[in-house]
Amino acid sequence: MPNPAETTTQVRLDKWLWAARFYKTRSLARDQIEGGKVHYNGQRSKPGKAVEAGALIRVWQGQDEREVRVLQVSEQRKSAPLAQLLYEETEASLKKRAENSEARRFNSQFAPSPERRPDKQERRQLIKVKQY
């Protein structure tokens, strides 16, 4: 007998994001959708939006933006390797994320980081500089 979750053609957007392991809980997924961090086929949507295979979903996670195409629809949360079979990330998205990570890596290399905390005299000099 086929599993009803596997034969489903439509699933709520928040449930699909949870099942595909973009978010740990459905409530986190719902909050991100309502906050405009998730776009379905180029438009903001609601958590109850029905997800269908072939749809394009844009998800912001931290500093990265991922654009994925839905390959399969599932209501059940599965292991990470099986969850990755539910979608594929677009080439443009992969390229953009790689460029952004390189830029962040180079920025952190050139950012000055002090070797130690400033002592009392150096703190007073910093305060004087900041006041002017």
UniProtKB/Swiss-Prot annotation:
Highest rank taxon of the organism: Bacteria
GO biological process: cellular response to heat
Domain S4 RNA-binding, chain residue ranges per copy: 11-73
GO molecular function (one): DNA binding
Region (Disordered): 94-132
Presence of keyword DNA-binding: yes
Compositionally biased intervals (Basic and acidic residues): 94-105, 114-125
Gene3D superfamilies in UniProt: RNA-binding S4 domain
Keywords: DNA-binding, RNA-binding
Membrane-spanning intervals of the chain: none
Protein's UniProt keywords contain Manganese: no
Function: May play an important role in binding of nucleic acid. More specific for RNA.
Family: Belongs to the HSP15 family.
Annotated NCBIfam families: PRK10348.1
Identification of the protein by name: Heat shock protein 15 homolog
The organism's taxonomic lineage, starting at the top: Bacteria, Pseudomonadati, Pseudomonadota, Gammaproteobacteria, Aeromonadales
Gene name for this UniProt entry: hslR
